[in-house]
Structure formats: structure tokens, C-alpha cells
Amino acid sequence: MAPPAVTCWLLDTRSLWTGDNIREAAADLFPLLSSDELASVTRKHFIKDARMSLGSALLKRAYIARSLGVAWDTIRFERRPDPVHGKPSYVPAEDKSASTISFNVSHQAGLVALIGTTADKTDLGIDIVCVNERNDYRVIDADGFEAWVDIYTDCFSDAEMWDMKYSLDDGVTLLDGTHLSAWELGRHDRCTRRNLELSATQKGQNGQPDRSVTFSSDLLVDAKLRRFYVFWALKEAYVKLTGEALLAPWLRDLEFRNVRAPRPGTVARCSTHGTWGERVSDVEVWFKGSRVEDVRMEIQAFEEDYMVAVAVRGDVREEVQVEKVDLARDVLPYTNKS
């Protein structure tokens, strides 16, 4: 029998609960939450953070109600194995047998992602990143990309640090759509500064002559920054799979190899929805110099700046399909389940 599928949902809260006060915008949903969940939502200073907190709470409950057929108001949570830092886990009602349901949630820049399964002996982790949300270029422009990566030296191995700073195995795409391979870039892959004018020779195709192209080093740094966030999301997803935090003492022993950034999708414009980009599933996981064979890692691009990384350990063979869900259609119907 085929192993149970893994569910992966993505909820976009950017256009939900408009205004600047979550208590007013989402008051009708507050009775659906526990006191702890409600406190987590309402203590957020910015409504964008409150939206994600509310979306996360609703998504977890909907997934459990759908997967186990339990009533919404009977769902309870606790953190395991550590009551403070552990992962939120479903606690079955007293008259229910222990459940094997497992899930993990991540949110960033308005999007909330959930991964879950009812398969026994399966561990999950998920992380979502947004490349252009933070003010990364302030440090990069002042000190260079090398110095910016060095901020995270406690999280990555020496090999990963070097790889992020000086490798662009996929090359770079210029503003006119021209793609330069890593071979054509040559030692420009070592460039870590913005605002430089670079030149390279593009190999002619189909009998066409070679041609010289000039481009800004901003494109190289942009590509490296996007790839850094791939490393970050993969590491975060793996750490969450283990139930530990990014303070885990073995972080630098965990290495990802064969890492490349998935090609982006397109951002939502006017009446169109944002689209999915490429999914990459051939990353290698290494720990203390040995290949980790029992954990599957994938990363999926969404719109131009988002990427969702998932980690799965267990008897799950198929690729994880990330599904965008709608609040009214896919989540709220489970609130009335009894």
C-alpha cells in the first residue's frame, strides 16, 4: 500500500482582515480560538503580524479537523517534547486514542505555510522565506556580501559559508533575459560588491559568434542573496523537523550540498493571482561528513520573492505538493464540524 500523502497548505493573509486593528477586523473569528491562541493574536503590535498569527491558528485547526474528523472546539494543543520550546502538538480528547498526526507551521511576510501528515513515525519541518522583506542591502552596501554572510557564521559550516559567498553554479540571468552560465561568468562568481560594472563573454549558439556583455554586479549579489535564503530555509525546515531551535549545538555539522535557488514565479497583478515557480528536490543533506539518506528536502518558489522549504523523514516517497488554500472555501467550513 502506498504511504500516506503529506499535506502542504499555503494561506495568503495579505488581503485578509483589512484595516489596522485585528480586534475590529476579525472579531467574528475570535470565538473560534482558544484563550492562548487569542492572546497570541491580539498581543501583536502590527496587524500584518496579527493576521499571520490568526491564519496560523485557523490553518492548524482546519487541518486537524479535516484529517481526524474531530470537532473544532475539541481541538487542544501542547508543545512537545519541551513545553516551552517544543513543536505545537495536537492533544486528543480523553475518549480518543492517541493520534499520530504531525504538523508544522511557518509564516513570513503575510503568507502562512503548514505541512502535515497522519503517517506514523514521520517527522516534518517547514519554513517560508521572503527574499526582499528585510533591509539586507544596508549591510551589504556598506560592508559587502561576504560580511553580511559572516553574520550567520554560527548557523552554517565553513563549506556552506564559502559556497554562499563565492559560488553561482546556475550562473545569472541579465535584465534582457540573457543567461550567463557559471563557466561564462568565470571568476566574476567571486564578486561580493554591488554597484560595479562587469563584462563577460557569452558563447555563441547555433553558429553565432561569441559576444561581449556588460552588466551590473547587483545581479550577482541579488542571485547570491536569493541562494542564501535557500540555505536558510532548508536549514530552518530541517531543524524544525527535529523539534529543536536554531540554537541547536550541531547546526554547523549539518550541511546542504548541491543547492540551487528555484526559478521564481510571478507576482500577483491586477486580477491575476501569484504563480508558483520551480520546485527543487535534489538537494543533498550531510551531517558530520556523512550523507543523510532518510530525510527528503524540497524547496518551492512562489511569486518572485517567496520560497517554501519542506523536510520530511519517514516512509513518504512522493514529492510534496504545496497547495494554496482559500480561507472561506478550505478553512472556515471545518469550524462547524460536530
What are these model-derived regions, one by one?
Residues 1-338:
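Core catalytic alpha/beta fold that binds nucleotide/phospho-ligands
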